[in-house]
């Protein structure tokens, strides 16, 4: 289940925002009890893709990025 501040990737290109498949972003808002999400994406130069903040992404469009903690 996806939740606030999860790191996700977009499964397919979004031509409306210019976000490409595989781009990592962070969930910044959960809508309708998890039926949709606002995701903040950045381009390869580190610039925020503003249009992504006005787009609702469904869980089917997103893939959670699993991270492993390494303790030293």
Where are the language model's segments positioned?
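Basic/aromatic-rich interaction segments and small domains that mediate binding to polyanionic partners
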Residues: 3-65, 70-71
């Amino acid at each position: 289940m996806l939740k606030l501040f999860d790191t996700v990737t977009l499964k397919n290109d979004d031509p409306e925002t210019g976000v490409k498949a595989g781009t990592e972003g962070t969930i910044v808002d959960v809508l309708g009890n998890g039926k949709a999400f606002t995701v903040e994406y950045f381009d390869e130069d580190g610039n925020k893709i503003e249009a992504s903040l006005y787009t609702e992404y469904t869980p089917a469009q997103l893939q959670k990025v699993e991270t492993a903690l390494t303790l030293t």
